[in-house]
């Protein structure tokens, strides 16, 4: 994880249409992307992604259902010198329950924390939608380790990124479904069931899903 203490490298999208002043509804900030069976990239097969930023300049999101294998949150805190290594590391309950995800294939050495809006760092936390925020500095990990962090949080290593127009094209090609997110699904501990739950959220039976289905 990067040790930088600065604002995350994502920008809040501009929502006003240049001609009418009306909100542009085409962007997907705060939405879930659900991979379709046609998805050929194994890194994203059966993935559920929370879209943190989406604009004409591209998109950025965090995969919610890819555990980072043997990576342990306490070990990461030790590596970052946030806590000292000992035989009996004692963390607050919220930190003990913290899951580490593979957030995506971009900047895999950097950590991104999706969290509830009860925690905010000026000039570092990016509010997204529906009480969900993103922070990518060490300060939030230090707060979590001390029991002073957000009530709900996920630590992701890396993120998923799209070039301008790329995500829109993938959706048109039936690579992704999309639907509104909710904190219960984002922060729920049932990692293995998130894909099925996300599909049920939009009324789709996973067993009936085909490569030809369109986007929601």
UniProtKB/Swiss-Prot annotation:
It comes from the Bacteria. Transmembrane segments: none annotated. This is UPF0301 protein Nham_3550. Coiled coil: none annotated. It holds the Pfam family DUF179. Belongs to the UPF0301 (AlgH) family. InterPro entries: AlgH-like (IPR003774). Gene3D superfamilies: VC0467-like. Residues 1-10 have a biased composition (Basic residues). HAMAP family: UPF0301. Residues 1-25 are annotated as: Disordered. SUPFAM superfamilies: VC0467-like. One of its GO terms (cellular component) is cytosol.
């Amino acid at each position: 994880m990067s040790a930088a203490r600065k604002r995350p490298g994502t920008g809040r999208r501009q929502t006003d249409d240049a001609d009418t002043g009306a909100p542009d509804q085409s962007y997907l900030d705060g939405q879930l992307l659900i991979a379709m069976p046609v998805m050929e990239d194994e890194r994203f097969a059966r993935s559920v992604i929370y879209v943190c930023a989406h604009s004409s300049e591209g998109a950025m999101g965090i995969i919610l259902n890819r555990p980072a294998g043997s990576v342990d949150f306490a070990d990461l805190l030790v590596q970052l010198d946030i806590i000292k290594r000992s035989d009996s590391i004692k963390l607050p309950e919220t930190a003990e329950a913290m899951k580490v995800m593979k957030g995506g294939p971009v900047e895999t050495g950097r950590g991104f924390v999706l969290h509830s809006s009860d925690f905010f760092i000026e000039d570092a936390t990016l509010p997204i939608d529906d009480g969900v925020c993103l922070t990518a500095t060490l300060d939030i990990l230090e707060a979590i380790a001390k029991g002073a962090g957000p009530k709900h949080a996920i630590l992701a290593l890396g993120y998923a990124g799209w070039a301008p127009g790329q995500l829109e094209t993938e959706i048109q090609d039936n690579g992704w479904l999309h639907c509104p997110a909710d904190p219960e699904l984002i922060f729920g501990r049932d990692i293995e069931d998130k894909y099925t739950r996300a599909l049920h959220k939009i009324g789709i039976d996973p067993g009936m899903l085909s490569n030809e289905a369109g986007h929601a």
